[in-house]
């Protein structure tokens, strides 16, 4: 806990709405010696709910969010935001969209030729549904932490992850939720490596059904592989 205290645990949990609480407690988090800035929306400072198109090829950030909703009066959904990370841009967390209270829908993260930190997430919510979010990792990219297509609470549905010619050092969860996880899909292609496990759907309290994992020739998953876990 000394490490967590030094890294300002409360501040970090607020930033990501509890999404990484388990990782923090497990001591997975690796932070730079100095806190970098967060990046929100098109201009880096606007917590917009929809329509963000963020493209970064340089700079050092603690977290990058396309869409972001952190109040109860936000729209019911944070939706249709896009984040693309290329070049030398460095960040611990990349999220197409995050909402503390509402749904996250149809958000996309693309990582191309880059090495990133702890979490890549198409869409994450602290209270509702994650629906039709997308993560694309390609072109010799490396993610040192976990990949989520959609991380919901009540449900996680129709999210997808595509990994090609890249390395993921932790687990891939295409759809994760306390409630039902349905119709999520991951494709691992073109000599990619996942050093832990791959789950199409992962439900803590509900059902997990109609989720798919496709691993093509030349790719390797070191840990467990399951279409759905409940």
Show the residue positions of the predicted features.
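Bacterial Sec-dependent N-terminal signal peptides
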Residues: 1-22
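Sec/Tat signal peptide C-region and signal peptidase I cleavage site
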Residues: 10, 31-37
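Bacterial N-terminal signal peptides
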Residues: 21-30
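Surface-exposed loop/turn motifs in large extracellular/passenger domains
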Residues: 37-63, 68-93, 99-118, 125-146, ...
């Amino acid at each position: 806990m000394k490490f967590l205290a030094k890294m300002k645990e409360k501040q970090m949990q607020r930033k990501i709405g509890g999404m990484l609480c388990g990782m923090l407690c497990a001591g997975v988090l690796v932070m730079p010696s100095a806190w970098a800035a967060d990046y929100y929306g098109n201009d880096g400072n606007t917590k917009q709910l929809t329509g963000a198109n963020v493209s970064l090829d340089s700079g050092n950030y603690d977290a990058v969010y396309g869409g972001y909703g952190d109040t109860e009066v936000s729209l019911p959904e944070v939706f249709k935001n896009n984040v693309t990370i290329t070049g030398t841009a460095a960040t611990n967390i990349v999220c197409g969209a995050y909402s503390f209270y509402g749904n996250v829908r149809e958000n996309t993260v693309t990582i191309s030729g880059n090495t990133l930190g702890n979490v890549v997430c198409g869409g994450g919510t602290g209270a509702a549904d994650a629906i039709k979010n997308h993560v694309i990792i390609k072109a010799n990219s490396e993610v040192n932490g976990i990949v989520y297509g959609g991380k919901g609470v009540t449900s996680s549905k129709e999210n997808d992850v595509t990994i090609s010619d890249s390395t993921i050092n932790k687990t891939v969860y295409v759809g994760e939720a306390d409630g039902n996880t349905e119709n999520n899909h991951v494709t691992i292609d073109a000599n990619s490596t996942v050093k832990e496990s791959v789950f199409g759907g992962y439900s803590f309290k509900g059902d997990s059904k109609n989720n798919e994992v496709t691993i093509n020739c030349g790719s390797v998953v070191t840990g467990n592989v399951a279409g759905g876990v409940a």
